[in-house]
Amino acid sequence: MKHYRKIIHIDMDAFYASIEQRDNKKLKGRPVIVGGNPQSRGVVATCSYEARKFGIHSAMPSAVAYNRCPYAVFVRPRFDVYKSVSEKIRDIFYRYTDLVEPLSLDEAYLDVTKNKKNIDSSIEIAKQIKKDIFREVGLTSSAGVSYNKFLAKIASDLRKPNGLTVITEENAQDFLDKLPVNKFFGVGKVTSNTLKNLGIKTGYDLRCLNLFELENIFKKRGYELYKFARGIDDRPVEPNRVRKSVGAETTLSHNLDIDEEETRNILDELCEEVCHRLKNSEKFGKTLTLKIKYEDFTKITRSLSLEHYIDEYNDIRSGVDNLLRNVEVNGKQIRLLGVTISNLSDKKETYKDITLFEYMDSIQM
């Protein structure tokens, strides 16, 4: 069966850190970490490729990153600058097609099956877009080209930085069969561990499971895994896709009591990550949810609806503290923590809203 869609996934290379290196020549070639101060409880938003050589990655506690590379340069995020650069990059995309689906400030899908330049080759379009981005904003990007979103997304990550990878219909199945399942887009840590425990290491191993087996193990997600293992993805590029929530969660390396200091430290990191993802998505949120899974696998959630939209770390952390106070101490230890913010709105619509702290001050006067 011949597919006729031409999909490109563009992913900027270490976007925030690359902008900092571009704007400050003294940082070029040095390990740069964008995120919180290592002396506080901040986390890494992103880091340069020089820093990644030390095993540093996003969402890592800044203190851990500092221990791995003490001479790294820590830089506070400049989201207004990142947003401005992102808008210039999107303008480049729109020269080629209106079918652009931004996933965040630094990545997007493009459907160039029919394009404004009347260029038949999607590979040539990807090359031109990469050249345009480098010439106009001074940054490198990586591109994945294929006949669906799933494969294009995987391809863009294969030859970073400044890479271009093509997955054709002819080589897709062979490529997927050899690919480790943890490299499949959308397969997170929990799913990856479940597959590993079942002895499933590659796409071929996954393809050997039938639909009934996958749905029995992964419920609704099983059908998606069944299709992805066969290179099937019918999702369209959606220019007006609405994101419903932003969240972060982690399965703990060892069980903890709810009132332990380490539990609070993990919540600090989760709130930092949610804050980072909110700003990256250019959103405000109005409903906070705390998720807790106990050692016996029972799960509870606590939610809080705010009067005003928020996107700042202090506001998110304060709200989570309020939710935590409503969790009963039941003697059971925690094995998973999660923080989600929903009821989202565009920043443009809510820019003048006051913060949670300002609101609390106003009702106390």
Swiss-Prot record:
Classify the source by domain of life: Bacteria
Query: What PROSITE patterns does the record point to?
Result: UMUC
Q: Does the keyword Chloroplast apply?
A: no
Q: Name one GO biological process term.
A: DNA-templated DNA replication
Q: How is the cofactor bound?
A: Binds 2 magnesium ions per subunit.
The EC designation for this entry is 2.7.7.7
One GO cellular component this record assigns the protein to is: cytosol
Q: Which reaction does it catalyse?
A: DNA(n) + a 2'-deoxyribonucleoside 5'-triphosphate = DNA(n+1) + diphosphate
Sites where the protein binds Mg(2+): D11, D106
Where in the cell? Cytoplasm
Q: Which Gene3D superfamilies match?
A: 3.30.70.270, 3.40.1170.60, 5' to 3' exonuclease, C-terminal subdomain, DNA polymerase, Y-family, little finger domain
Where in the numbering of this chain does the UmuC domain appear?
A: 7-188
- Residues annotated as the enzyme's active site: E107
Question: Required co-factor?
Answer: Mg(2+)
Report the protein's function.
Poorly processive, error-prone DNA polymerase involved in untargeted mutagenesis. Copies undamaged DNA at stalled replication forks, which arise in vivo from mismatched or misaligned primer ends. These misaligned primers can be extended by PolIV. Exhibits no 3'-5' exonuclease (proofreading) activity. May be involved in translesional synthesis, in conjunction with the beta clamp from PolIII.
Check the record and name the NCBIfam families matching this protein. Answer: PRK02406.1, PRK14133.1
This chain belongs to the protein called: DNA polymerase IV
Q: Can you name the source organism?
A: Clostridioides difficile (strain 630) (Peptoclostridium difficile)
